[in-house]
Amino acid sequence: MEKKKVTLTESIIILIVLLAILGISVIKFGLSPEVPVLFTVLLLTFWARLRGFSWQDIQNGIKEGIGVAIIPIFIFMLIGALIGVWIKAGIIPSIMVLGFNMISGSFFVPSVFIVCSIVGVAIGSGFTTISTVGIALFGIGSSMGANPALVAGAIISGAVFGDKMSPLSDSTNLSSAVAESELFSHIKNMMWSTIPSFGVSLILFWILGNSGHMDPTKIERTSQVLQNNFTISWWALLPIVLMLICAWRKIPAIPTLFMNIAITVVMIFIQSPHESAQSLNNLIMNGFVAKTSDASVNALLTRGGISSMMATVALIISTLSLGGMLMKFNIVQSAMEPLVKHLNKPGRLITVTIISGICINLFVGEQYLSVILPGRAFKPAFDKIGLSPLALSRVLEDGGSVINYLIPWGVAGSFAASALGVPVLQFLPFVFFSLLSPVFSIFSGVTGIGLKWAKKNK
């Protein structure tokens, strides 16, 4: 069959069918997303061949899709290694014990949200926040008997806030660059949607965090088990300080993680001078295996290792293969282009831009593309009606990068689920910050409150 340009109707049908397959498989039947995503890749490949696309076209689409994830995949592998050595060296157990002594049960969940927000702004990486301080706070919550999904929601909400508002964040810099807005003006302008989202999220975490029962006996028992089996000290916080220094010095993620793993390995050898190279290799590859007298502590701290990230890596490769093919065959672009012609009102334009970012997260699963594609598609429309580039860059964050954590087959969502051990569909209702950000952004667009216009229109 001769290859022809994909029509709008055809694009919409394909996107609806693919989303239906993924949604029914993951949500209705509770399947792990890896196989349904691979099945959609197979279906799209079959359609592409029927439409006249060559195997080379298909392979190029897959390669282009996966290409954007090579660095994140490498970072995920390093984070897996970091989690294992951090537990072995007593870093995560030390944070847990210190947390037991410093955070009251009644204000625990809001405290998790606030701490992860602060760390996220300082580090500029939601992934690193979740996989380090986030895991320690999750452990504290488990020991307190808090709802795991609620605690995970607070951790992710704080990490997303920090990632969104940090000048060190990749996604923040990307949104600013795509919209051609000045970085710090962009961060300042985001407060119109970010502050209300943060405030409402904090209230909801406080209300829901007080609804559970905290068991002080279990907390004391867990603290004692940790102190009996790990080296608990303030020195264990040294790798965290190193991470903050690297963020302040704007050192990229990969060398930061390498340095952190190296200094943690040195700490392990100081604590256990006779540690063999074989056991260290096994720790980095397969993670830490806790063997304490408490089964709940063992379940909580048996994690990490490069191998623990392989399921996430497989999902990312499959999802981005699908996304790359959708882009290569112009399916996503052809579905977006007609929308631009009819958007001459700020409220309508902002709403459609946010919905487009959400849809790209659903179909492509990659947060950077959920910023880049709507940014390129709708920038002329923002310019045409006189909106400032700051309006566009804020919308790209609110509908793009913050949403990826809510997608079971998304890069960020699958990573958070793997790191915390809570499925996306369980923590999704509690990631209030990500859920509220697009709502307040649309409200701003419809009402005009906090909406930034180009200077020539003012």
Summary of predicted features, one role per range:
Residues T132-F138, I155, T256-V266:
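Central hydrophobic cores of alpha-helical transmembrane segments
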